[in-house]
Amino acid sequence: MMSSPPSASVQQDPTIADFLAKQGETDATLLPLPGDASARRYMRLEGRGRMLMQDPSDPAGFAGFVSLAQHLTELGLSAPQVFGADPDTGLALIEDFGTQTYSVQLAAGRDESMLYALAVDALLHLHHHPQAASVQVPAYDLATLLEELSIFSHWFAPTLRPDIDPEAFDAEFRDLWREPLTLSLSGPRTLVLRDFHVDNLMELSERDGVRRCGLLDFQDGVTGPAEYDLVSLLQDARRDLEPGLEQAMLERYIAAAPDAAGGADAITRRYHLLGAQRHTRIAGVFLRLHQRDGKPGYLHFLPRVLRQMQVGLDAAGLTEVIAYLDQTLPGWRGAGPALAKAG
């Protein structure tokens, strides 16, 4: 994570100053970090090995971060330690894992297969742990998976075809997904971190085993299908993996997966179904970020997301979904470059 220059408004914010004083941090210099798609902000306490997290707009996400950070640590994984938290102001003082995200490491030429293997092993550790799902988080169930597809219906579909009735499209679209998504939930349920990708993973070189993989941005965790986080990692909307790496890492996971997962064919089937759903949802999310939230930067990734969506639909054998998209949204397959330019 790169830091920005100290912000005077942050330094003088009485709410922040009061919170830090209660944590024994009265003279810290705060360095704001770049934001992401959420309203959450992070500020590094220069030279302290600690970071201030601020998220007053999402009490559920704030509480989720605090509880899941402790839970993941108890499971033997590396999540930031929470030194203090105030739900009323949405402020938390947390451990600073430093700057070496996977994204930074990969940009510097670090061995890609080694980093991804470490992340896969961290997922395997999580999925084998009998207490992984023993935490109070929402269920990632059929209703939720279908509801997420409505983002595509209400943002992507009318962008491509302004005359479309989003509600009618959504009803038919979701009906086509209901049976395959039911199948995607047929495996064992575990803790799903949901945004398990290179921007949210750190290499903690001073730690051993799977604890070398630092976990970030897990506050939206749910209980659901194990393969979902594998999709997040290996079918990243933001970057292409080197040729053959996705398959190699999928095979690495399958070789050591819990017996309850049902073997290679069952895991692979769920992996492709969840990938198709995820990319379809993200195509809608990126347009919503642009049109509703004024964040056009994510449109840059749309061509890749639509390619991944096509591959996922084909791999999952969702022929009826493909036919419906071809009929109702002609040209959707090649819409990525034009939509990317809109930002």
Predicted regions and their residues:
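Acidic, serine/threonine- and proline-rich low-complexity regulatory regions
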Residues: 260-272
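ATP/Mg2+ or Mg2+-diphosphate-binding catalytic cores
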Residues: 284-343
